[in-house]
Amino acid sequence: VSKFANFTEGDVQLMDMTEYAEPYREYVVESRLGLFSREGKLYGCPTHVGATVAFYNTELLDGVGIDYTTIKTWDDFKEAGSKYHEETGKSFGNLDTSTNMFFNLLVAELGSDYVDSDGNLSVNNQGIVDAIQLMKDLQDANAVSLMPGGNTDADEGFAAYANGDFAAMIM
């Protein structure tokens, strides 16, 4: 997806799929189609819209008396993470540094984006500022720390979870 824009520059070498997608538009998340559109034409159709989920290692959490079912907000997550760190010296959750999955989740949750409605770069808008602040607050509270290897899909990330270095994963 991140490379798709490269294929829509200049003389587009892709087939316009607008008419083929039209009967299905009501069943597709419209914002996903925007990723594959240029000048009103659709050049690709997404086949996946990922959901965000939280995974908790209940064995680790039970050991320190944290009930993951009570975590409903980022404040709850921060409180549980601080308690977990106090009890174990380990991190509750993580922040990735290579994929920005967590950051992008927060930006979207806050109703923001990297560009404004006119397509202009907007990296200092309030949603982005608030997402960065929330990540900083979580880290300052010892609720999260940086993921070894930069992300959960790296060998170091796999090992960190297998070793019990983190009790929660948001993805």
Segments predicted by a language model, with ranges:
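Hinge/lid segment of periplasmic solute-binding proteins
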Residues: 2-52, 62, 75-78, 86, ...
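Alpha-to-beta junction loops
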Residues: 1, 12-13, 90, 163-171
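Bilobed periplasmic-binding protein-like "clamshell/Venus-flytrap" ligand-binding domains
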Residues: 43-44, 85-97, 142-145
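Glycine-centered hinge/linker elements that transmit conformational signals in sensory
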Residues: 80-82, 120-150
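Short, solvent-exposed loop/beta-turn-alpha elements that line the ligand-binding surface or hinge
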Residues: 18-30, 70, 87, 112-132
